[in-house]
């Protein structure tokens, strides 16, 4: 039951961060490309790599994993919004933007998970 509270708390924080980051990215870059979703996915992927590596090194409690790994990062990152925005770009005929979005999300997010893990593992 305690882990549910941590997941809920982390989720509420992650949702607020996601909203604020998305609004900020629209203000900076406009809305012609889904930079907000890309940014939250990249940040979340990096943090997931860090949390995973810390967990592997037994330096993170189950409560922190629930708070950050499931709650905060689960609410911060978004595959459904990425999918919807990519489909909208395709439906608008913006194929280059759609495939750029797919490539950036996939490549950057995988790299950021790796980078987060390596950062932690190199310090342990």
UniProtKB/Swiss-Prot annotation:
The cellular location(s) given in this protein's UniProt record come to: Cell inner membrane
Q: Name one GO cellular component term.
A: plasma membrane
Q: How is its activity regulated?
A: Na(+) is not transported, but it plays an essential structural role and its presence is essential for fluoride channel function.
- Which catalysed reactions does the entry list for this protein? fluoride(in) = fluoride(out)
| Top-level taxon of origin | Bacteria
Q: What is its main location?
A: membrane
Name under which the protein is recorded: Fluoride-specific ion channel FluC
Q: Which organism is it from?
A: Shewanella loihica (strain ATCC BAA-1088 / PV-4)
Q: Provide the gene name from the record.
A: fluC
């Amino acid at each position: 039951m305690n882990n549910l509270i941590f997941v809920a708390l982390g989720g509420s924080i992650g949702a607020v961060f996601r909203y604020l980051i998305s609004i900020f990215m629209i203000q900076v870059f406009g809305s012609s490309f889904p930079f907000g979703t890309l940014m939250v996915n990249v940040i979340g992927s990096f943090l997931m790599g860090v949390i995973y590596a810390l967990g592997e090194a037994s330096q993170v409690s189950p409560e922190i994993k629930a708070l950050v790994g499931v709650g905060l990062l689960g609410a911060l990152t978004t595959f459904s919004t990425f999918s919807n925005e990519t489909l909208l770009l395709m439906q608008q005929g913006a194929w280059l933007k759609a495939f750029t979005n797919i490539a950036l999300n996939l490549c950057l997010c995988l790299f950021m998970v790796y980078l987060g893990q390596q950062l932690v593992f190199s310090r342990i």
